[in-house]
């Protein structure tokens, strides 16, 4: 086990220590988040470039839960468009265990950075959305909701390969916890959040991920977020400004009386044609966008239907869009009991997952 210091991050204010095997030569800091840092590294025996994600989750139960979900799900899926875990650094002992190191494929950038720095061609948009939906088909067939799809969670490399990452908010679609439990700790980026999450529809379904894909496609087409809400009310207002006031049928699909009353209190809004918002975009792209961004989740296109949409015809291949087996019922057992689990118990779960 070596204690390696990668180059300090851009602020230049501190070094970041990585307690990883001497098989890895640590290179540069490539990303930082709330409870972790990612460095590029070289696996010396093979010469392979990898990303090492150092996570320090044990201060907060929420970070422990996210880490556990991430490890379990990334190990479960084996898919070209889902980031894979190549290895997990085994700790020396439980007593000294206070950091998690995930070794993953190294990707060069992410969709957020790409959208900010360049205009995407129609062909790029097709290929990136196709790959995102291809990954989502595997997740949804396994009864997994990602719940946090956004441009920064779509990793890219120079030849336009796309891989979905960050499964820390994922849940089983099969076991409907009561919706309040489902929503606790829901910190997904507001801009990509489906309206039913804010309006508490009867249940949350795979359609919440489809909405996020619609928001991402819109952002790729225009170079800016479609619904950049500053808060809950602003977010809903922006959505209704574009989609118009819900029909009576859609209105009564909203479970929460308070949410219904709030929508009734708003002035009537006419739908804005997507053609007005995206004047240079192809008809097929706009047709898919309409179907991805249906207000009512019941009317929203499914992932399978979206893959067959004419806009994605250049890439669609039904023989090369694999599913994944449904996750076992006990897969997310720890989530069912999360409110009663101590940080120490969660740490034990993470340790067991690493050592298995």
Swiss-Prot record:
| Phenotype caused by lack of the gene | Impairs the formation of appressoria and the ability to infect rice plants, even when inoculated onto wounded leaves. Leads to decreased transcription of the cell surface sensors MSB2 and SHO1. Blocks the transcription of both virulence genes GAS1 and GAS2 during appressorium formation.
A single GO BP: MAPK cascade
- Please give the catalytic activity noted in the UniProt record: L-seryl-[protein] + ATP = O-phospho-L-seryl-[protein] + ADP + H(+); L-threonyl-[protein] + ATP = O-phospho-L-threonyl-[protein] + ADP + H(+)
* Cross-referenced PROSITE patterns: MAPK (PS01351), PROTEIN_KINASE_ATP (PS00107), PROTEIN_KINASE_DOM (PS50011), PROTEIN_KINASE_ST (PS00108)
| Sites where the protein binds ATP | 30-38, 53
Taxonomically, the superkingdom here is: Eukaryota
Q: What is its EC number?
A: 2.7.11.24
Acetylation among the record's keywords?
no
Give the function comment from the record.
Mitogen-activated protein kinase; part of the MST11-MST7-PMK1 MAP kinase (MAPK) cascade that is essential for appressorium formation, penetration and invasive growth. Central regulator of appressorium development that acts downstream of the cAMP signal. The MST11-MST7-PMK1 MAP kinase cascade transduces signals from the cell surface sensors MDB2 and SHO1 that recognize various surface signals such as surface hydrophobicity, cutin monomers, and rice leaf waxes.
Protein name in UniProt: Mitogen-activated protein kinase PMK1
Which organism encodes this protein? Answer: Pyricularia oryzae (Rice blast fungus)
């Amino acid at each position: 086990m070596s204690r390696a210091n990668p180059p300090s991050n851009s602020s230049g204010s501190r070094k970041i220590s990585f307690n990883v095997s001497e098989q890895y030569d640590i290179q540069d800091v490539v990303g930082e988040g709330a409870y972790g840092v990612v460095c590029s590294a070289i696996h010396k025996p093979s010469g392979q470039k990898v990303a090492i994600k150092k996570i320090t989750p044990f201060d907060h139960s929420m970070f422990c839960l996210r880490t556990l979900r991430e490890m379990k799900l990334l190990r479960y899926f084996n898919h070209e468009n889902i980031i894979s875990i190549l290895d997990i650094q085994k700790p020396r002992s439980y007593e000294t265990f206070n950091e998690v190191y995930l070794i993953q494929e190294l990707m060069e950038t992410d969709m957020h950075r790409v959208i900010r720095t360049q205009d995407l061609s129609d062909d790029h948009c097709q290929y990136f959305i196709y790959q995102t939906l291809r990954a989502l088909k595997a997740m949804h067939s396994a009864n997994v909701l990602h719940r946090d799809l956004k441009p920064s969670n779509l990793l890219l490399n120079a030849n336009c390969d796309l891989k979905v990452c960050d499964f820390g908010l994922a849940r089983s679609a099969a076991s409907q916890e009561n919706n309040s439990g489902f929503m606790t700790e829901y910190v997904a980026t507001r801009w990509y959040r489906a309206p039913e999450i804010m309006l508490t529809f009867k249940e949350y379904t795979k359609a919440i991920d489809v909405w996020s894909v619609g928001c991402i496609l819109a952002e790729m087409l225009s170079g800016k977020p479609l619904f950049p809400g500053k808060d809950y009310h602003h977010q809903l207002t922006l959505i209704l400004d574009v989609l118009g006031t819900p029909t009576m049928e859609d209105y009564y699909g909203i479970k929460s009386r308070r949410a219904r009353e709030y929508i009734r209190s708003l002035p009537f809004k006419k739908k804005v044609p997507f053609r007005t918002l995206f004047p240079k975009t192809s008809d097929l792209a706009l047709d898919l966008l309409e179907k991805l961004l249906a207000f009512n989740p019941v009317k929203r296109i499914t992932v399978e239907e979206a893959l067959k949409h004419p806009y994605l015809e250049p890439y669609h291949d039904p023989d090369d869009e694999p599913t994944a087996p449904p996750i076992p019922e006990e897969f997310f057992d720890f989530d069912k009991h999360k409110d009663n689990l101590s940080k120490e118990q969660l740490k034990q779960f993470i340790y067991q997952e690493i050592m298995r």
